[in-house]
């Protein structure tokens, strides 16, 4: 038993950063609202998370000026569906602001937060359940990942092939990424304050050493 769980049963919360604007792709509409099979992409994502019974709630972090979500998912907000327009200038800032929102809504340091990208609509509820099972008794947490299948090449300074990278023990990080709130929040804050480039939650935790 670790220090987070003494006498307290931790809850699981999903946090979905959904504040992207589509600026990197040049799209007129953010990719999370692109239509897929008759629904906005993010709707499929949230439907999958809704099938995970162990999630106490799912918090969607939107840009302050988002004017698409309410029309796209009019029935989402409720007891297990939370929305906060606290998105930041980067994904990491949006997640950090979302963590603060969870605290404001009563989440405790021992609770688990599963951060999942809004655009990853193919996530399966059973995969999320397996992640929760795998991390429930862990001190730190974990993430979904796939073993690398492609051949990787190392480039030199002139963008010429310098060698082949061994794929042994190499994995492609996926989401959700599951960490305790009391660990992830200070890890992400420290990385942002230090100007460290954070590409996912695991990299923030790794930066703690």
Model-flagged regions — what are they?
Residues 91, 118-122:
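Acidic metal-phosphate-binding loop of nucleotide-sugar-dependent transferases
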Residues 109, 123-209:
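Conserved core of the sugar-phosphate nucleotidyltransferase
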Residues 54-58, 82, 140, 190-193:
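Short active-site oxyanion
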Residues 74-111:
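Short phosphate-binding loop-to-helix
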Residues 2-67, 81:
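N-terminal glycine-rich phosphate-binding loop and ensuing alpha1 helix
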Residues 28-31, 36, 40, 85-93, ...:
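Residues at secondary-structure transition points
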Residues 67-73:
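Acidic helix N-cap motif at the loop->helix transition within catalytic regions
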Residues 112-116:
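Short aromatic-hydrophobic micro-motifs that form the base-stacking/packing surface
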């Amino acid at each position: 038993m670790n220090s987070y769980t003494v006498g307290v049963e931790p809850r699981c919360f999903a946090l979905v950063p959904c504040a992207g604007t589509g600026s990197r792709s040049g799209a007129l509409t953010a990719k999370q609202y692109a239509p897929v099979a008759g629904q906005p992409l993010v709707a499929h994502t949230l439907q999958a998370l809704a099938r995970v019974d162990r999630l106490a709630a799912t918090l969607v972090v939107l840009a302050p000026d988002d004017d698409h979500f309410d029309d796209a998912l009019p029935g989402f907000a409720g007891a297990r569906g939370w929305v906060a327009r606290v998105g930041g200038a980067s994904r990491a800032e949006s997640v950090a602001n979302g963590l603060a929102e969870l605290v404001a809504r009563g989440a405790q340091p021992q609770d688990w937060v599963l951060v999942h990208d809004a655009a990853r609509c193919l996530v399966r509820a059973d995969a999320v359940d397996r992640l929760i099972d795998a991390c429930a008794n862990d001190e730190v947490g974990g993430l979904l990942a796939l073993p690398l299948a492609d051949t990787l090449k190392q480039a030199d300074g002139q963008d010429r092939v310098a060698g082949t990278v061994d794929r042994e023990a190499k994995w492609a990080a996926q989401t959700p990424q599951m960490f305790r709130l009391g660990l992830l929040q200070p890890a992400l804050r420290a990385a942002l304050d230090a100007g460290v480039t954070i590409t996912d939650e695991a990299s923030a935790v790794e930066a703690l050493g």
